[in-house]
Amino acid sequence: MRMNRLHVTAALLLPLLFTAAVPDDVQRFEIDRTHSRVGFAVRHMGVATVRGEFRDFEGHLLLNTADITKSTVSIVIRTATIDTGNERRDNHLRSADFFNAEQYPTITFETRRVEQGAEGYVLVGDLTIRDVAKEVHIPFELNGPITLDGRQRLGAEGSVQVNRKDFKLMWNNMGEGVNVVSDDVRIELAIEAATPR
């Protein structure tokens, strides 16, 4: 009988423990992929800019409404879904010369912290490409949240420039000093996210 009472007590306490672990001022927002974009821009031959995006990605934001700098962001991007509007080029980007999508199917971003910036905020976190993690600082603008159809929605936009060679994206078929593809790549994020249904 004593054992049964212990089991009942534990069953009643567990939900309370889990509830206490998530503060009331933290809200979970899931990325709405149909209203979001994860893109990039890079110079080609030094004379033109090629733009592209990844079609498949997911992630979430844990928004601390009391202190935004305590919020966290997690994003997973599937490299095989890269799209620059040119099938031949996209296949090359999926190959071992660049993202090697078969061996490295995802790119990830995980925040370390959020800082107050001069205008808006700065995401500081680890960007991982081809199993190479580098700390990046992404200035971003946060809009919202608003309430629509019983759910809260917010938007965030930001960009950051990275050196592709830091992530072992080394391909260049014209030798040293002449880049078919610039070393510098601008990553562009336009995210809309909503609370779960």
Regions found by a protein language model. Give the residues of each.
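Bacterial N-terminal signal peptides that target proteins for export
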Residues: M1-A10
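Bacterial N-terminal signal peptides
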Residues: T9-L17
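Short linear motifs centered on Gly/Pro in flexible linkers and helix caps
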Residues: M3, A20-A21
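Low-complexity, acidic/polar, glycine-enriched regions of mature
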Residues: A21-R197
